[in-house]
Amino acid sequence: MPRRRVIGQRKILPDPKFGSELLAKFVNILMVDGKKSTAESIVYSALETLAQRSGKSELEAFEVALENVRPTVEVKSRRVGGSTYQVPVEVRPVRRNALAMRWIVEAARKRGDKSMALRLANELSDAAENKGTAVKKREDVHRMAEANKAFAHYRWLSLRSFSHQAGASSKQPALGYLN
């Protein structure tokens, strides 16, 4: 525990083109070696391509793709006695966004298309249609949580460590077995 006051999370400046903090965070996750302008041009180009394909606005299409990749539950390792259990826990909203964006960027980097903008556009397009590597990753995480729901009663161990975070206990669990 820190002896001094707990520092709050820094506010991120909204994206200059669309005014979205979520998109600014996405640009930061995509950025390599501090080259923000390069990351922004890749994201804007990918969103333009995505908007042309979907017929929606750039931000709307991005939000749909992100929503389809956001996980609701994940597993955390908890040591009880001599055994380690994979305990399903609900994912907090900020972490949902962070995981979804990270998975989309990772999946786009692994694709074999010509440019990064095209790879990102294709991955976002696949995510909007509920297919693709990032959506598969979310389904794998959900499948792991479902397979380990027998250990959900150990959840109090993981909640105890998150009790200092606001809203940890006020939210309803995403799945019934987390009650």
Curated annotation (Swiss-Prot):
It holds the Pfam family Ribosomal_S7. It comes from the Bacteria. Keywords: Ribonucleoprotein, Ribosomal protein, RNA-binding, rRNA-binding, tRNA-binding. GO terms for molecular function: mRNA binding; rRNA binding; structural constituent of ribosome; tRNA binding. PROSITE patterns: RIBOSOMAL_S7. GO terms for cellular component: cytoplasm; cytosol; cytosolic small ribosomal subunit; membrane; ribosome. The strain K12 sequence is shown. One of its GO terms (biological process) is ribosomal small subunit assembly. One of the primary rRNA binding proteins, it binds directly to 16S rRNA where it nucleates assembly of the head domain of the 30S subunit. Is located at the subunit interface close to the decoding center, where it has been shown to contact mRNA. Has been shown to contact tRNA in both the P and E sites; it probably blocks exit of the E site tRNA. Belongs to the universal ribosomal protein uS7 family. InterPro entries: Ribosomal_uS7, Ribosomal_uS7_bac/org-type, Ribosomal_uS7_CS, Ribosomal_uS7_dom, Ribosomal_uS7_dom_sf. Transmembrane segments: none annotated. This is Small ribosomal subunit protein uS7. The gene is rpsG. SUPFAM superfamilies: Ribosomal protein S7. The lineage of its organism: Bacteria, Pseudomonadati, Pseudomonadota, Gammaproteobacteria, Enterobacterales. Part of the 30S ribosomal subunit. Contacts proteins S9 and S11. Cross-links to IF3 and the P and E site tRNAs.
